[in-house]
Every structure is written in C-alpha cells, then in structure tokens.
Amino acid sequence: MSLLQRIKQHLLPPSSRSFHAFETNANAEMHQLRLENTSLMQQLAYMSDQLTQITEQVNQIQAEHAYEQQRDMMLFWAEYQKPSESPIAAKKRFFRSLPKAKGNLQLLQDNQIKLFKEFDSICRNNGIIYWVGSGTLLGAYLYEDIIPWDDDIDVFMTRSQIAQLQELLESDCTYRITTLWDWYVPCKQIRFCLQDTNNPAFIDLFPLDLTNSDPEYAWNRVLEERASFVKDIRNEFQGTEWESIPYLPTTHPITKNIERLYREHVASLHDDINYVSSFEDATGLTRGIENIDELHSTGPYPINDWIPTQDMKYRDFSVMACSAWNTYLTRHYGNYFKIPKDINSHEHVANDYLNSEAVQNSMHHYLGK
C-alpha cells in the first residue's frame, strides 16, 4: 500500500458499509453485555436470598445455643450450690476455686499487687480518694484478689487528686507517674509505677471530673465531646509522627498540638457543664475525654453512688470502691458471674518482654526474692 493510500485510509471517513458493519457488531456486543448483566443480577439476587436464609439459620442456632447454655448453667449452679448456701455465695466459691496464675503471670500479678498496696497506703496517708474499676473491681468482689488471668490494675481518681499525687511524687525515689498519648485508642495513658524502668508493674489512673450539672446530661454531653475529640485527632494527626510513634511521651514536641486540641474540646464542655472542685458541691462525676472508651457505658455517676467509698478486701489489704459497685459492674459486664471469653487472650504485658533477664531480676528484687 502506497503512502498516499495509507493517509487516505486514516484521514478520510469510513464508508457507509463499514460503518454499518461496525454498528451491527457494537449492537451485538451491547446485547451480549445486557444478557450477562441480567444473569449477574439474577445470581446476585439468588445469593442475597441465600445469605438471608443463612443469617436466619445462624441466628436460630445462636438463640438455641444461648438457651442451652443458660439451661446448662442453671443446672450447674443448682448442682454446685450447697443446701445451706445462697446462690451468690455458691458463685463466689466457684470463682475463688479457679486455678491461680502461674509462671510469669503470677510473678507480674504479685508485683502489681505489691505496688497497689503501696499506692493505697500513699493515698490513705494523704487523704486521696480513688475507686477501683473494671476488672480490678470485679476481682475485688468475686475473688477478693486479682482475677487469675488479669495483668493490670484500673483505678479512677478525680483530676485534682491525680495532680495532688503527682505533686507528692515529684521528687520521690521509689515511685513516679508517667503520661503518654496512645494513638491506637486514642487516649492519654496516666500510670503510677516504680522508678525502676525494668519493672513492668503499673496502675492505670483514669481521671474523673466533678460537676453539679444534671449527672445524666453531663455524662452524655461528655460522650459526645469524646467522640468529636477522637474524630479531630484522626483528622489532624493521621500521617504524622504520632502515628509512627503510637505511644508518644508527653515530652515530645507534637504533644503541644495534641494538648491544644484537647483544651479546645474541654473548653467546649465548660460552655455546657458546670464543673466544681469539691465533693460537697458536686452532684456527679464524669469521665475525662482523654480516657479510653468503654465497651459499654457505665454512667452516669451520681455523686451519692461514689461518695462515701466502700472498702473491699483485695488479697491482704483493702481497696476503695464506689458504693454502687453492683450497678457499675452490671452496666460494664452484664452478667458478671459469667466466665469471660478473653481468658487466654487478655494480655497487656507481652510474655516475651517478661522473659527478659533485666525484667525478671527487677520483679524478683521488688518482691525481695
């Protein structure tokens, strides 16, 4: 084909015959696509129907399983309970008969409890109030000890009393309070621990604020602000150094911006909630927006449910708890006499870390071994 013919073929419009042939072919392909699309839609409808049926069957199986589990537990407790024993006493006896922790977990728990006993002594000697929460409260009630598979201590304190404790320990040679911002949750971790950085024992401190606003309104308003705070954190700090250093010490330069954002949200709360500084003026307590989220909301916290505190036995000493401990535990766990599903997965301190020689030496030394 000559150069002139090739130019003519590319530049001149197609003939009527070739155009109609192309149109016929395109229409045929479009028809085939419509058929295939119709077939796919039919398959999708069938699969959707099948999924609905499977979901209904799964729900039915789960309901039957829940019923059978409940029936089996009723039969178990009826058999387990002694003639002269109350149902609650029987359940406590059962939980307290469960095997205790062994190995590294036992060593860590013994360190945690020794530290907790010393923390309690510091608080009582200095007029500082705290409340055990979450699994620590459950352990105090069910086991009079740490839960056999637990590895941390959770404590609530008012913000002003955390500050008082920090001031007490400012130049202490044995104890310290650490703070860092956690990207994963996100939250501000506040912990009471030893000056010995090789010892993994710690007590989580969760700040509460006193208010004389309506307790339920204040509680829900704080939940709203917490959600807004978390959203703003994700929007502002995603892709920053905080994401690559997920446990960010408060000495890091970027925390200035985190604290600025935090103060903005706290200021928003102060527009709607009246915060007070004394228990006498308070009608309730609210969680700080820097706290970790609860899986199930345990509030509101009317002040009469929390003050005065109630002592509960915890191994060889007593800990402070809220007087409405049953309400708190029920909101937090539902039926708290059930064995949880995270017995084997509950871990705050990695076992590999506990195995290190420096950590082992520190934990044994702290216990005087």
Please annotate each region the language model reported.
Residues 1-83:
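Boundary detector for helix-to-coil junctions that initiate low-complexity/charged tails
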Residues 57, 63, 67-132:
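Helical scaffold of the NTase/Pol beta-like nucleotidyltransferase catalytic core
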Residues 68, 72, 131, 149, ...:
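Tryptophan-centered motif/residue detector
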Residues 100-124, 169-224, 235-333, 339-369:
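Conserved catalytic core of two-metal-ion nucleotidyltransferases
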Residues 120-153, 157:
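Active-site nucleotide-donor binding segment shared across nucleotidyl transfer reactions
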Residues 159-162:
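Helix N-cap motif at beta-to-alpha junctions
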Residues 165:
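Conserved SAM-binding loop
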Residues 229-233:
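A short, surface-exposed interaction/processing loop segment used at functional sites
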